[in-house]
Swiss-Prot record:
Transmembrane segments: none annotated. The keyword Secreted applies. It comes from Delia radicum. Its main location: secreted. This is FMRFamide-like neuropeptide GQDFMRF-amide. The modification Phenylalanine amide is found at residue 7. GO terms for biological process: neuropeptide signaling pathway.
Length: 7
């Protein structure tokens, strides 16, 4: 969600 390894 927050573009940290696609979370």
């Amino acid at each position: 969600g927050q573009d940290f390894m696609r979370f």
